[in-house]
Amino acid sequence: MERIQKGQYVQVDFEEAIASIEQVHDSLDSYVDFLLNKDEGRRYLEAEGLSVEELQSHLNKIKEIILSYTASIVEIIDGNVHWDQIGEKLSGFVNWLQSELQGQNEVDLFTLNFDLLLETILLRIVGTDDFTDFHVKRGTHEGSDKFNFDPQQTLLDFGVRRVRLHHLHGSLSSFKRLSDGRIFKLRAEDIRLDDLYKNMDTKELFPSIITGGFKSKKVQRLPFSYYYGKFKEKMVDPNNLCEELYILGYSFRDEHINDAISERLKIGRGKNGVPLKRFVIVDYKTDEEQQEKFIHDVNTALELGKKTRLKREDGIFIFTGVDSIEEIIQVKS
């Protein structure tokens, strides 16, 4: 909360805070469900002369806390993710991304971040003709333009776009309408102007993001199952393997993501394998001891043994932050 008060957003902080709140909510929700919907629970309520109304009020209050906290994050993101600031703080990253997107190569970008950083950059350097996030403009939500998640309709309307953005864990501008399961996005400025998070009726609408524990289970729901399916396809489908893999600012704490990356590395080591032409992992740790621990943690997460483990001298790791990836342009050329 201290960072939020200073107008700072760190996704790890956000995820850990929401995870703690979610854990309380899920435990309480499970208990209320037991009391209301199980024979044993109903008998217990009747025998003890108890009511679940107070517990349900606690559940509603927890939802309010989640939405209030998320609203603060949206406000910070909306105030900071602008082209001028991106160009000033991430010029190296933007230059590298622009070089990767030149020509007619197809590029899939997978992000675990909830913000709209990549959308902002891609709309500027690629434009709408070559870029898709699998949403199509359809109708409005309370007067604001609504963009439905619909990969099939996107393909029918626009054909195959060569630059594709996948929000593996959703984004703060994405919502699920509970009445029919419709997933849609709103513009960040509309969310802020309408104070949507603070005014949201959680019986009708809820943020479409993955946080907290059990991500491997949560990823089985739409739209996350679609995004993860495409990610895994690039890692394991012999007819659609990625040739280059750049991993920027990832903690290697999501088992389902690690498993897919591990499979791609195994394919590269096989007898008739297809190794990656380029494999880069970018992090920001400056202390050598922390760097060594990170390398060890990556090898553990990817289940790499003595013969296959990634080493510093392989040139895979860059520890000077995401903006320094621009150096790769010179190396490749």
Task: Give residue spans per PLM region.
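SIR2/sirtuin-family catalytic core signature
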Residues: 214-220, 225-333
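Short, hydrophobic/aromatic alpha-helical segments in well-folded domains
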Residues: 93-97, 117, 151, 230, ...
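Short secondary-structure boundary/capping segments
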Residues: 1-4, 123-132, 182-183, 261-263, ...
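Extended, H/D-rich, highly charged conserved domains that either
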Residues: 9-67, 99-209, 219, 223
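A short, well-structured juxtamembrane/interface segment
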Residues: 84-99, 223-234
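Glycine-rich phosphate-binding "P-loop"
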Residues: 67-88, 207-224
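Short, well-ordered amphipathic alpha-helices
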Residues: 88-97, 122, 258-265
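Catalytic domains of lipid- and phosphate-ester/thioester hydrolases
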Residues: 2-4, 30, 89
